[in-house]
Amino acid sequence: MKRTYQPSKRKRRNSVGFRARMATKSGRNLLNRRRRHGRHNLIDL
């Protein structure tokens, strides 16, 4: 049986990377929320 998590750096960047977050309004909201909170890393890759 194939496992559910098949890691790929490219897929991960495309779905949860900085540019993916900037592409949608909700993603930008998420980044601003993390900035307000004082996160050292905005994107947790």
Curated annotation (Swiss-Prot):
Keyword Coiled coil tagged: no
Q: A Pfam family matched by this chain, by name? A: Ribosomal_L34
The record ties this protein, via PROSITE patterns, to: RIBOSOMAL_L34
Q: Where is the composition biased (Basic residues)?
A: 1-14, 31-45
Q: Which Gene3D superfamilies does UniProt cross-reference here?
A: 1.10.287.3980
Q: Which GO terms describe its molecular function?
A: structural constituent of ribosome
Which BP terms does GO give this entry? Answer: translation
Disulfide bridge map: none
- Report what the protein is called: Large ribosomal subunit protein bL34
The species this protein was found in: Chlamydia felis (strain Fe/C-56)
